[in-house]
Amino acid sequence: MTRKTFRLGLMALDGCMLSSLSGPADALRVAQTLGEIRSPNNAPRFESVVFSPRNARRVRTESGIEIGNIKPLGRDPKFDLVLVPGINHHRPGELWHRRAEFEPEFAALRMMHLRGTRIAATCSGTYLLALAGLLDGHRATTSWWMAGSFRRHFPAVLLEEQALMVEDGNIITTGASTAVYSFVLRLIAQVGGEELAQQTSRMMLLDGERQSQAPYVSQALLEKPRHSLSEKITHFLDKQLHNQITVARLASHCGTSERSLLRHFRANYGTSPLGYIQHLRVERAKALLEATQLSFDEVVERCGYSDAPSFRKLFKRETSLTPADYRERFRLRAR
């Protein structure tokens, strides 16, 4: 009996994240080994091929480690799926301004997409798919800290920023960095079955149960709008978050009308004032759950809420975890 071979194409380019390429390749190799132990004659073969649309023989990754033995793409690539890695950059919108650098990658991605090849992108690699026009009209996710910039530059993409992974047709996108492992476990399950994916997950200590980026979002790391009104808003909310805050009170403090304030929030924060205040209160609750032994009722009070059950629902909606589960998962970071 001929064993099935699944070929994963790993797109290499200068400044890419090494783990975006090596992580999936290692996981597939582990899966193949486990499969051969379980069923020597029927286990699927996984082949990982590092290639360059520019026919480069070597690339220097973000960490400074060079990758050699890179294959040229060729005119008729035989990949079952192609993965676009995360790319080094310092600001969320930087790749938009550097888009002219990636024309060879765009051309290759469009060509493979037209031929029906499945394409996946992880972390900031999702930006390349969007810049190539492959995500227009599709559901997608990206690194949570890039979501604001992504939404502004690609309004035709149906962004699900809290999702860890989104599969829409022949296109798969994942969130930040290690979300690539959720993708590769899904891939192993599709090719070799759920049991093989679970065994690989256990062998490599990978969490195959993660569904959302929401628990990891930090407002402190998000891009801040550069505007004098935004600075007034930030200063006021930092000082008053534990108190009751109305749109009228916030507008009065900032010296603007409620209507202008609403427009400013939609344009710069992508949400309403109430939605943004709720985000900040959840952020404060996360910090208190991580770093203190306060009871949940005490946390709720310090976040400006008086209704603990209501805030509990808000917290779970925003983070996908209950407050108790969040504290259990993240409290060790404070020790």
Question: What is the predicted function of each stretch?
Answer:
Residues 232, 236-239, 247-280, 300-325:
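Basic/polar phosphate-binding segments, predominantly the helix-turn-helix DNA-binding elements
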Residues 239-243, 291:
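Short helix-capping/hinge SLiMs at alpha-helix to coil transitions
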Residues 163-174, 191-235, 239, 252-253, ...:
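Short, Lys/Arg-enriched, Trp-marked, Pro/Gly-tolerant hinge/linker segments that flank
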Residues 277-286, 325-335:
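Short, basic, alpha-helical segments at the C-terminal edge of helix-turn-helix-like DNA-binding modules
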Residues 136-162:
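A conserved active-site-flanking secondary-structure segment within enzyme catalytic domains
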Residues 153-191:
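Amphipathic alpha-helical segments enriched in hydrophobic/aromatic residues interleaved with Lys/Arg
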Residues 2-130:
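N-terminal functional module of multi-domain proteins
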